[in-house]
UniProtKB/Swiss-Prot annotation:
Domain of life: Bacteria
NCBIfam families, per database record: ATP_synt_delta
Natural source organism: Chlorobium phaeovibrioides (strain DSM 265 / 1930)
Main location: membrane
Full protein name: ATP synthase subunit delta
Function: F(1)F(0) ATP synthase produces ATP from ADP in the presence of a proton or sodium gradient. F-type ATPases consist of two structural domains, F(1) containing the extramembraneous catalytic core and F(0) containing the membrane proton channel, linked together by a central stalk and a peripheral stalk. During catalysis, ATP synthesis in the catalytic domain of F(1) is coupled via a rotary mechanism of the central stalk subunits to proton translocation.
Keyword DNA repair: no
Gene designation per UniProt: atpH
Amino acid sequence: MSSVIASRRYAYAFLSAAEAGGFLETVTGEMQMVGETLAASRDLQRALASPLINADRKTHLLEEIFAEAVGDKMMLFLRLIAHKKRAGILGGITQEFAALLDEKNGIVNAAVTSATELSDSQQKALSRSLEGYTGKKVRSAMKIDESLIGGLSVKIGDTIFDGSVRHQLQLLREKLVAVEA
């Protein structure tokens, strides 16, 4: 089984259990903190993924790092992951948990790239437009790329809306080349 599929299954199972048990709000913050800790420590990621370190040692490592910072339910989940020899995909589990939670709450992530910085009113108008298109709440991550020349590009999931001047020039170039051929 691929690590992405396994990560999604563990994340879904934990999310479902947390929702049914009434502790979803608590573990949401804890899961985010675990993910941030993993993202910040390459050594921790390597240790958890290493086949040379046994499950008991990985459990002990997770307990040392997170026992004071997380509650009993989250610690039990971390022990389970280590016991099942899935500690190496813990980072993926935290990402999938966040994605499933967003899906449950009707939130989509949009990567917005513009040639210049958008004003607050432009960002709000863009968010309203994207929310109207998707029918969901939109969380935007803004980025500036001057090579777009003008306009902007928006990526939501697998869909890209490219309204940049660079893209329009590229389309025009392709049409001119096709006419010449």
